[in-house]
Design a protein with these regions (language model features):
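Primary mode marks residue(s) on the alpha4-beta5-alpha5 output face of response regulator receiver
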Residues: 29-56, 64-182
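Bacterial N-terminal signal peptides that target proteins for export
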Residues: 2-12
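Sec/Tat signal peptide C-region and signal peptidase I cleavage site
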Residues: 24-28
Length: 182
């Protein structure tokens, strides 16, 4: 007969196992077809891919020469798995945080124009930092592809009257996260 403590330990271990398995439902094994300029390094493989839906947030600012322009402040998007479950969030940094608490930040390494002019560019991002242990702990590269929307407002709408105002531009994209092959 098992005592209560042993039963609870088994239950907790089973719950942890189920939690770990549930994070695997977004796992991908194949690299997406992308232009050479934004291909992840050959020694990396896809760990997970997610769909982003949210906004690119722009702010109207004046440059040193007095010209006004909309500049990117931050993305703000939910990350979903292939079943539509929210599994993380994309925010300023840029940063991507997974539901297990792990987070990766990065810096754009390469870009290509999106196939449609009203969409933000496709990117290859190099990881610059990590926090927490989990899905994003060992990510080294991130691709942003299949973008739709997200471009800033027309430049003519940024002027003295709009200085420091924000504008959100809806967008969707697919993000592929890469880590070194085992």
């Amino acid at each position: 007969m098992l005592d209560f403590s042993t039963v609870m330990t088994i239950v907790m271990q089973f719950a942890l196992l189920l939690s770990m398995l549930s994070t695997m439902n977004t796992q991908a094994t194949e690299r997406p077809a992308v232009p050479d300029a934004i291909k992840a390094p050959a020694g990396e493989s896809v760990i997970v891919n997610v769909h982003a839906s949210g906004s690119q947030i722009y702010v109207c600012q004046a440059s040193a020469d007095g010209k006004f322009a909309w500049t990117l402040k931050a993305p703000d998007a939910d990350l979903s798995d292939d079943q539509g479950n929210v599994v993380g969030h994309h925010s300023a940094g840029p940063a991507w945080k997974y539901r297990d608490g792990s987070e990766v930040t990065g810096k754009a390494a390469a870009r290509v124009d999106a196939p449609t002019p009203d969409s933000i560019p496709w990117l290859l991002v190099s990881a610059t930092g990590h926090t927490g242990e989990g899905m994003f702990s060992h990510i080294t590269s991130i691709q942003r592809i299949n973008t739709k929307g997200g471009q800033p407002p027309a430049a003519s709408t940024c002027d003295t009257a709009k200085l420091n105002s924000e504008s959100k531009s809806s967008y969707t994209a697919d993000y592929y996260f890469f880590a070194p092959k085992n």
